[in-house]
Each structure stands twice: as C-alpha cells, then as structure tokens.
A protein has these predicted regions:
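A well-structured
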Residues: 1-175
Length: 175
C-alpha cells in the first residue's frame, strides 16, 4: 500500500487553490473592511424601539440587514479560508477570532429585533405592509420569527444570549 502525503500549500498549483484574492487583495484590505463593518453597529442600534413606527422604518431595517450580510460575508469567508490554508498560522486564527468577536457585537446590537417583531400585533403589521409594499419581500422572514413566539426570550435575555456567542465559539477558536 502506497502512503501519500498531503502537499504543503506552497507545493500546490495555483489553479488548485482558493482564489482568496477575489475576496480581498491583501490582509490589510480585509482589516480595512472589518474596521468599516464596525460602523454598522450604531446604524443597527438606531432602530431599537422603532421597528413598528412605520412600514418604511421596518423596510429600512431589513435593507440594512441585507447590506450587512453583503458586506460581512466576504469578511467572514476570507478569515476562515486564510485560517484553513494553514491552521498553524496564529495570525489567521486571530482573524477568525476577530470576526467571531464582531459577529457577537453585531448580534448583541440587534438583539432587539426578534422581541420587537413579536410585539407587533397583526393589525399593526398589516398596516406596515400596506405602508411599504416592498416589505412583502421580507414577509417570510417576519413570519418565521413570529412563528417562534413561544420560544423567544425578552430583549434583555436575547442580548445576554447573543453576548455568550464568543464564549460558545471558544472551543473552536483555541490556538
């Protein structure tokens, strides 16, 4: 039986590697994107207590959520792929840890979302849909949240749970 070794990354042909530079050209560009993403936190918290004010407000909140996803996904994937390239490189493990910390901050900032959506009665929700017809694009998301009504914690309890995210990820991030 022949024993084969896994080649070192530098010995793998370029066409067989991830095109990580398609996400960010350099680690510094990734750091800049992560720093810029932190500006989302005050934008999210500005919606606290306001989701039911108008259809337009709720629509702007969901659009911000979309914007965050589009900006944050490449940041997450870059850090994870860099870490996967060579798990011995502490700098890339730290990048994953930074992403995890930021995700926890963002989840904590948005912890009000579910309790506020659940607090909207059906009549008000119908009014919000009428005020902003584009909210229909988010109906499935809203319905999924509202269906879990019996299993959702209060605003403060959701924030505590979100803050525990970094601790829960710790076993995966030890390096």
């Amino acid at each position: 039986m022949e024993t084969r070794k896994i080649p070192a990354r530098e010995d793998v042909a370029a066409q067989d590697k991830w095109a990580i530079e398609d996400l960010f050209a350099t680690d510094d560009a990734w750091r800049e994107a992560l720093a810029a993403a932190k500006e989302f936190i005050p934008r999210v918290t500005a919606f606290r207590g306001h989701l039911a004010e108008s259809g337009e407000t709720l629509l702007r909140f969901f659009r911000l959520d979309d914007e965050i996803s589009l900006a944050f996904d490449p940041i997450v994937h870059y850090a994870q792929r860099r870490s996967d390239e060579d798990t011995r490189v502490a700098a890339y493990q730290e990048m994953v840890a930074q992403v995890t910390r930021f995700a926890v901050e963002l989840q904590s900032a948005a912890a009000f979302e579910t309790p506020e959506l659940l607090a909207i009665d059906d009549e008000t929700l119908n009014r919000l849909y009428a005020e902003a017809p584009e909210l229909e694009n988010y109906r499935l998301c809203i319905d999924r949240v509202r269906r879990r009504r019996e299993h959702v914690l209060s605003d403060k309890e959701e924030a505590i749970l979100a803050a525990a995210g970094e601790m829960a990820a710790s076993p995966d991030d030890i390096y």
